[in-house]
Swiss-Prot record:
Catalyzes the conversion of dethiobiotin (DTB) to biotin by the insertion of a sulfur atom into dethiobiotin via a radical-based mechanism. Binds 1 [4Fe-4S] cluster. The cluster is coordinated with 3 cysteines and an exchangeable S-adenosyl-L-methionine. Binds 1 [2Fe-2S] cluster. The cluster is coordinated with 3 cysteines and 1 arginine. Homodimer. Its cofactor is [4Fe-4S] cluster; [2Fe-2S] cluster. It is an enzyme of class 2 (transferase). Pathway: Cofactor biosynthesis; biotin biosynthesis; biotin from 7,8-diaminononanoate: step 2/2. The lineage of its organism: Bacteria, Pseudomonadati, Bacteroidota, Bacteroidia, Bacteroidales. It catalyses: (4R,5S)-dethiobiotin + (sulfur carrier)-SH + 2 reduced [2Fe-2S]-[ferredoxin] + 2 S-adenosyl-L-methionine = (sulfur carrier)-H + biotin + 2 5'-deoxyadenosine + 2 L-methionine + 2 oxidized [2Fe-2S]-[ferredoxin]. CDD domains: Radical_SAM. This is Biotin synthase. Residues 43-272 form the Radical SAM core domain.
Length: 330
């Protein structure tokens, strides 16, 4: 069956949900990994995309996402502060560009950003573009088309809005907003001309079937940059005692995400420090071809130089010429 699916993918077809379930439950794992590797190289070549983020506003979020240290609903040790200045953001962006990183995102806690905050962010992005040629991304919650247009007009080319998990599982993790609201933001971002980056977190108690559901969901909304975070349970949050994924579960998930999303950048993200170096290498071999590098929000990330060296050792070229979404549905 694996060979049949590989041939179908190469000829423009797709796996079915039922086939993905069978691969997860009964396929020889090494054969699955090898197939995902070949599909990665066939559709994506040897380019490896890098980006970095800065937590431009931290804590006091009114939303109740059960995994998140930023929520005011939970007693965590997260540092709380308002928006960083344009100067600080630009200095961080320039530093990351000097490390060879191609993209830089301002990430802010909260359900949304006020118009005043959007104007402050616009100033930050203008300052960044004056200082460096790094590509600008933003992750500021649920935004209207008007606010997204302001960001786009000030240099933001990519908007990040994680769908987080499978539609069947999301309501059990968050009650203060819906995935449909996230989809509305993604559609608005595309209407103003932005690319979209959207992924989520695995290991929050979802089943493998729900991970497959999630991968197909992202495919259905034409996402071509998919951060795959691994839950790092944070004391004080409802998920603090969630048991970790096994290494095999993680690698199988990466392989299935690759077969379901053959043309996407699958991106190392938060929580990956839990993985051994050998598993990180294996994940890159199987299908990871991008990374959020540096320190990631409230969990431990990975230093840029180390990530780039790892990608090169795994046969990739670290490049800034990795645009996605040549065309997409509005």
């Amino acid at each position: 069956m694996i060979q049949t699916i590989e041939n179908r993918l190469i000829n423009g077809g797709e796996p079915t949900f039922e086939e993905a379930l069978l691969l997860a439950s009964s396929a020889d794992k090494e054969a699955l990994y090898e197939t995902a590797h070949r599909i990665t190289r066939h559709f994506m070549g040897d380019k490896f995309d890098t980006c970095s983020i800065i937590n431009a506003k931290s804590g006091n979020c009114p939303e109740d996402c059960k995994w998140c240290a930023q929520s005011r609903h939970y007693a965590t040790s997260i540092e709380k502060y308002g928006l960083l200045s344009a100067t600080v953001c630009a200095e961080q962006a320039a530093y990351n560009r000097r490390q060879g990183i191609g993209r830089f995102s301002l990430v802010a806690s909260g359900r949304t950003a006020s118009m005043n905050e959007i104007r402050q962010m616009a100033e930050s992005f203008r300052t960044i573009k004056q200082r460096t040629d790094i590509k600008c991304c933003a992750s500021l919650g649920l935004l209207s088309e008007e606010k997204l247009q302001i960001l786009f007009d000030n240099g933001v080319t990519t908007y990040h809005c994680n769908m987080e998990t499978a539609p069947s599982f999301f309501p059990s993790l968050c009650s203060t907003h819906t995935q449909e609201e996230k989809l509305a933001t993604i559609r608005a971002a595309r209407r103003v001309g932005m690319r979209v980056c959207s992924g989520g977190i695995i290991g929050m108690g979802e089943t493998m079937e729900q991970r497959i559901e999630f991968a197909f969901f992202l495919h259905s909304i034409n996402v071509y940059s998919i951060p795959i975070n691994i839950l790092q349970p944070i004391p004080g949050t409802p998920l603090e005692k969630t048991p970790p994924l096994s290494e095999e579960e993680y690698l199988t998930t990466v392989a299935l995400f690759r077969l379901i999303n053959p043309r996407a950048f699958l991106r190392f993200s938060g929580g990956r420090a839990q993985l051994s170096p050998a598993v990180q290498r294996k994940a890159i071999y199987i299908g990871i071809n991008a990374a959020i590098t540096g320190d990631l929000l409230t969990t431990t990330g990975s230093k840029a130089a180390e990530d780039m060296q790892l990608a090169r050792e795994c046969g990739f070229q670290v490049t800034n010429d990795t645009d996605w979404e040549v065309s997409y549905d509005h």
